[in-house]
């Protein structure tokens, strides 16, 4: 299989890339890793007349957290859209600041695909089963988009409109992903997180995925929680309702079971040749329970924050 003929440009700056997008509009596609776009072009599912290579733009390569945080702020961790998934996976600052993303990245394809794929590319591609997109929604990340008119922001939870469809305009480029940090835990509390999924084969797109991040007090009561499900809806789903349900409760088997049952009531999956709707509901219940248990265990073995 071969793609249709196209023109190729490699802008030296982000401003040049935005100018090219403004000129060519829907006829142009950005390429950084090409992990998703190139196969689609080979199958002629995507037929861009122009391919704009942004893989070497330094403006898109940042991994940054504030050196000092005010007492009343959780802070923000900024990841450039062009950062390779393998770089993010190995970066010590990223692993310490965004442990949930570090766990999710292990499930993304294979080592070879993570060596090419970028954080921003996965988010913009819009696959409902994408691990990175799910974590961005669960952690309530903010996406910075840029065009010739300047920068704008959109919440990750509002970015996805339908399968493979996002709110980004043809002339816009995703530049940064801003993750709110859980940086100021209460005295004596601990935090934990987990990501899990089920697929037909290792490295395949998930039939259903789930993730959770929790903060527990010394007695095991939940102080804060975020939960999400992927692959069981037209969009990656953050479920703040589940977090609210867990806050104040002791995170024991009963509370986890109630949350897992509630998760099923919040989704309406569709069946396909890979899995029926009922099977996806079953997987959602199992995976939500599993990630909450694993996150609880992770928190229980973490070092408590001193009062």
Q: What kind of region is each of these model predictions?
A:
Residues 1-307:
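C-terminal structural segment of proteins
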């Amino acid at each position: 299989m071969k793609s249709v003929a196209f023109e190729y440009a490699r802008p030296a700056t982000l401003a040049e890339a935005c100018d090219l997008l403004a000129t060519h509009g829907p006829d142009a596609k950005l390429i950084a890793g090409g992990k998703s776009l190139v196969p689609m072009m080979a199958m002629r599912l995507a037929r861009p007349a122009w391919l704009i290579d942004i893989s070497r733009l330094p403006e898109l390569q940042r991994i940054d957290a504030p050196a000092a945080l005010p007492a009343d702020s959780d802070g923000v961790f900024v990841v450039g859209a062009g950062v390779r998934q393998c770089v993010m996976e190995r970066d010590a600052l990223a692993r310490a600041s965004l442990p949930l993303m570090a766990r999710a990245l292990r499930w993304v394809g294979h080592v070879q695909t993570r060596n090419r794929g970028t954080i921003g590319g996965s988010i913009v591609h819009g696959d409902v089963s994408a691990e990175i997109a799910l974590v961005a929604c669960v952690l309530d990340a903010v996406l910075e988009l840029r065009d010739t008119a300047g920068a704008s922001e959109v919440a990750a939870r509002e970015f996805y409109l339908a399968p493979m469809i996002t709110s980004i305009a043809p002339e816009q480029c995703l530049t940064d992903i801003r993750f709110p940090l859980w940086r100021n835990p209460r005295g004596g509390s601990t935090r934990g997180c987990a990501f899990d999924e089920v697929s037909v084969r290792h490295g395949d797109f998930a039939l259903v995925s789930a993730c959770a991040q929790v903060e527990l007090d010394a007695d095991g009561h939940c102080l804060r929680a975020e939960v999400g499900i992927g692959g069981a809806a037209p969009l990656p789903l953050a479920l703040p309702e589940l977090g609210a349900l867990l806050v104040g409760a002791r995170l024991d088997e009963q509370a986890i079971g109630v949350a897992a049952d509630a998760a099923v009531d919040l989704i309406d999956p569709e069946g396909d040749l890979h899995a029926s709707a009922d099977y996806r509901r079953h997987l959602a219940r199992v995976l939500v329970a599993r990630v909450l248990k694993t996150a609880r265990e992770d928190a229980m073995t973490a070092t408590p924050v001193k009062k």
